[in-house]
Every structure is written in C-alpha cells, then in structure tokens.
Amino acid sequence: MRKKIEIIAEVAQGYEGNEKLANLLTKGAIASNTDAVKFQLVYADELATPDYEYYQLFKELEMMPRIWIDICQKIHDAGKKVYFDVFGLFSLDMAKQVG
C-alpha cells in the first residue's frame, strides 16, 4: 500500500508581522496546490527577554488573533490543513484557538 505524501507550504515567519503579506503568502500557498500551510506563531516573550538585542524584532513579527483566525479560515475554506510551529504556552493556546 502506498502512503500519500503530504506537501506543506512553509511560510514560517515570512509574513514579517504584516497582515497584507501574510494574506498574500497564504493566497500563494493555497494556489500552489499544497496539502497544508505552515506558519511560525512568534511571540517575543516566548523567545527572549526584553533586554535581548533582537527582542523588538520578535515583537514586530507578532500578529493579532483576528488576523490568524481570518488566515486559517481562508486555508480551511480551500480544503487545506494549517500547521504551526509554537514556542511556548501562549502560542500553543493561540494555535488551538485559531487553527
């Protein structure tokens, strides 16, 4: 019996905290005929302390839950799966809530 290979479009954090870019990348991933789309749910407080030199960069990657809900809905409406990399309890809870 042959197993089906799942093809995943890895967006990661390529959306750069930008809602328009996240939607554009989502649209491209859906159009690419993949089985799933994967993002990194980045929240600065899960990755670093405020005194870390790249803390603000991580803060800029954060997006509001309503944006993630909208993105996940588009992906599900297209019949695709959504996967997330999570880095702590907050992003895990967010993934459960939106995905």
Give the location of each predicted region.
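Conserved, mostly hydrophobic/aromatic
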Residues: 10, 29, 95
